[in-house]
Each structure stands twice: as structure tokens, then as C-alpha cells.
Design a protein with these regions (language model features):
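Helix-loop junctions and terminal segments of transmembrane helices
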Residues: 32-53, 120-125
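Interfacial/gating helices of multi-pass transporter permease domains
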Residues: 9-29, 97-100, 156-161
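Residue-level recognition of pore/gate-forming positions within transmembrane alpha-helices
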Residues: 26-29, 72, 76, 110, ...
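Interfacial segments at transmembrane-helix termini and the short loops linking adjacent helices
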Residues: 15, 81-111, 157
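Membrane-interface helix-loop junctions in multi-pass transport and translocation proteins
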Residues: 16, 83, 130, 137-172, ...
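Alpha-helical transmembrane segments of polytopic membrane transporters and translocases
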Residues: 5-7, 19-35, 66-67, 167
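Interfacial transmembrane-helix starts/ends
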Residues: 54-70, 74-82, 100-103
Length: 192
């Protein structure tokens, strides 16, 4: 999915806009590095906890999951707030400064991807990986359609929207499937 937006931009909008978009995209990808590190620590922790599961450990997993999810949102917010400084000091070409407008949406997209990876852990643990394949195929098709229609209507910004919407869809569908294969007290957690 990461490359489809660039292919559509190059063909539908032009190489110059692709260059500007790519700069903003790369800055937004800082969240990808953070969430990849978090998920690398998360999955072994999750699998260990799930092997010794009790109702209390389920609550602990849910609580920690929400904290990590919030942490990713906060990190994306901080990146968004400091991105003007990053652009000022590291993106020296004036023609690329407008790439700043893509950073927040791309950072948010990678937050959603991190959330997806967290919930995918439950599916992997239950050895239901086929569902992840189905979800991925659906999302690739969904992303291609979104890129076409959103870029056609909103230009390069449509590509950023398509990425965020696709990763959010990835997360939501995976969360629903995850809950079916390994029920957790995600909603009831708030009632207690």
C-alpha cells in the first residue's frame, strides 16, 4: 500500500508533486519507526501473557494496549507540532516546504498501522493468520480504489487521506476479527 499512492500521484498529478509529497511522507514515517519498535516488544510480551491468561491479565493487557495506543497518538501529535522546525532546518529547498501539509495525516496513518499490528498479535497467537491475509487483500484493493478516487478529487492530499483511511480500515477490521478469535474486555474495561 505504501507505494500505490506514489504511483497514482506520479501518473495523475506529476513528478514534481510526488517529490513534495515524498518529503512530507518521509517525515510522517518517523512514527513507523517508533511503532515498529513498540510492536517488536509488544508481541513477545503479549504471547507470554496470553499463555498464562487470567481475567486479571486480560484487563492488564487491555490497559497496556490502550496506553500504547494513546502513546502513539501523542507521539504523532508531537511530530506534527515539531514538523515545521524539522522542515525549517532539514528541508532546505523552498519548493519542498509545502510537503509539510502531509506530515500529520501520514503520521496518523502510521498510528493506525501500529494499532493494527497490536491487534494482529491476537490473531497470530490463535494461529488464524489466514484472516490477516484476507484483510490485507481487501485493504490493498480498497487502498487502490481510494487512491484513484481521492487523488482524482483532492489531488496529492487525496493520497495522504487514502493512506490514513486504508490503515484505519486495516485496524478496525483486524480489531473486529481479533475480538472474534480471542475475546478481550475492550469495551467493558471502561465500565469498571
Amino acid at each position: 500500500m505504501d507505494l500505490s499512492d506514489q504511483l497514482f500521484i506520479r501518473e495523475m498529478v506529476g513528478k514534481e508533486e510526488l517529490g513534495i509529497y515524498s518529503i512530507g511522507y518521509k517525515v510522517g514515517m518517523i512514527i513507523l519507526i517508533l511503532q515498529a519498535a513498540v510492536v517488536m516488544a509488544w508481541q513477545p510480551f503479549l504471547f507470554k501473557k496470553l499463555k498464562e491468561i487470567t481475567p486479571q491479565k486480560k484487563k492488564e493487557i487491555v490497559q497496556l494496549s490502550y496506553l500504547i495506543m494513546l502513546g502513539l497518538v501523542i507521539a504523532a501529535g508531537i511530530l506534527y507540532l515539531i514538523s515545521p522546525l524539522l522542515f525549517k532546518y532539514f528541508v532546505l529547498s523552498p519548493e519542498y516546504q509545502s510537503g509539510l501539509k502531509y506530515v500529520g495525516i501520514i503520521a496518523l496513518a502510521y498510528v493506525f498501522l501500529g494499532w493494527y499490528k497490536m491487534f494482529a498479535g491476537f490473531i497470530i497467537y490463535t494461529k488464524n493468520n489466514k484472516y490477516l491475509s484476507y484483510i490485507a487483500v481487501f485493504n490493498i484493493i480498497f487502498n487502490l480504489l481510494l487512491n484513484y478516487f481521492l487523488i482524482k478529487n483532492y489531488g496529492t492530499m487525496g493520497a495522504a487521506y487514502a493512506t490514513a483511511i486504508s490503515y484505519f480500515s486495516f485496524f478496525v477490521i483486524t480489531a473486529v476479527v481479533s475480538q472474534r478469535v480471542y475475546p478481550m474486555p475492550w469495551i467493558s474495561f471502561f465500565g469498571k
